């Protein structure tokens, strides 16, 4: 897409990263439904449902986004697809129903590498991108 502005895309991608992470942690399915493809939404919703059924709570603190960069961009017909690599610092804690830590450490900041793929139909008047894939490096 000749109108693609990488700098403003990355500004929006950083905001989306924070909003999606926050909505996932709080279990806000409505926010997620508007930002994610159906497949990604179904995966996120399933993880939230499982967490809630188990009586677990998650605390995810995004300390900082150290870097965001476009690592791949392509066109499939009128669909622009952009994969972004995020380097962030996060604190991740999963607690059981009694508040006991069952995963993570509330006092440990972890370096996290995520690859998020966004897509949008460039022939559409809608300027918003949708998150269509996620993966993390562990």
Put a short name on every predicted segment:
Residues 7, 38-39, 65-68, 73, ...:
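Surface-exposed loop/turn and secondary-structure junction residues enriched for glycine/proline
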Residues 83-138:
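Compact beta-sheet-dominated globular domain cores
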Residues 26, 38, 74-80, 112, ...:
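Short flexible coil/turn linkers enriched for glycine and charged/polar residues
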Residues 1-63:
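Core segments of small alpha/beta cavity-forming domains
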Residues 46-53, 63-68, 97-101, 111-114:
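Short amphipathic alpha-helical surface micro-motifs
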Residues 56-96:
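Surface-exposed, charged secondary-structure patches
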């Amino acid at each position: 897409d000749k109108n693609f502005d990488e700098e403003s895309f990355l500004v929006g991608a950083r905001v989306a990263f924070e909003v999606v992470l926050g909505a996932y942690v709080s279990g806000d399915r409505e926010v997620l439904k508007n930002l994610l493809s159906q497949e990604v939404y179904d995966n996120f919703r399933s993880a939230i449902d499982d967490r809630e059924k188990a009586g677990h709570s998650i605390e995810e603190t995004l300390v900082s986004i150290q870097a965001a960069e476009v690592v791949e961009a392509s066109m499939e017909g009128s669909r622009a697809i952009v994969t972004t690599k995020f380097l962030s610092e996060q604190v991740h804690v999963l607690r059981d129903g009694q508040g006991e830590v069952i995963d993570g450490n509330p006092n440990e900041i972890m370096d996290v590498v995520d690859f998020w793929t966004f897509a949008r139909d460039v022939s559409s008047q809608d300027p918003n991108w949708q998150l269509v894939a996620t993966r993390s490096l562990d």
